[in-house]
Design a protein with these regions (language model features):
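Surface-exposed, beta-sheet-biased, low-hydrophobicity segments with strongly acidic/polar composition
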Residues: 1-90
Length: 90
């Protein structure tokens, strides 16, 4: 299922869980509209700095949105957190 802007905004400040050896919570901190055709937007996630996730598609679970496959791009990583972005063009 592809997310729309309204669904993404409803999930602000809630975790998406990535199942690794130890589950990793990615907290949705921003939903921003972007220039593009249709209803383009980005989702910005913040999580622990380790493990560093390479750019690729991940299966994430959300309490109300269910399972989502998102292509995550690392934006920044420092000693306190890592920030990732997913872009949508609906």
């Amino acid at each position: 299922m592809s997310l729309n802007l309204e669904q993404a905004r409803s999930a602000l400040d809630t975790p998406f869980v990535l199942d690794l050896n130890t589950p990793l919570d990615l907290w949705l901190r921003e939903v921003n509209t972007v220039t593009g055709p249709g209803q383009a937007f980005s989702m910005i996630f913040r999580t622990a700095p380790e493990p560093v996730l390479p750019q690729q598609t991940y299966r994430l679970r959300h309490e109300t949105l269910g399972e989502q496959w998102l292509f995550l791009v690392p934006l920044t990583v420092d000693s306190e957190s890592a920030v990732y972005e997913a872009l949508f063009n609906n």
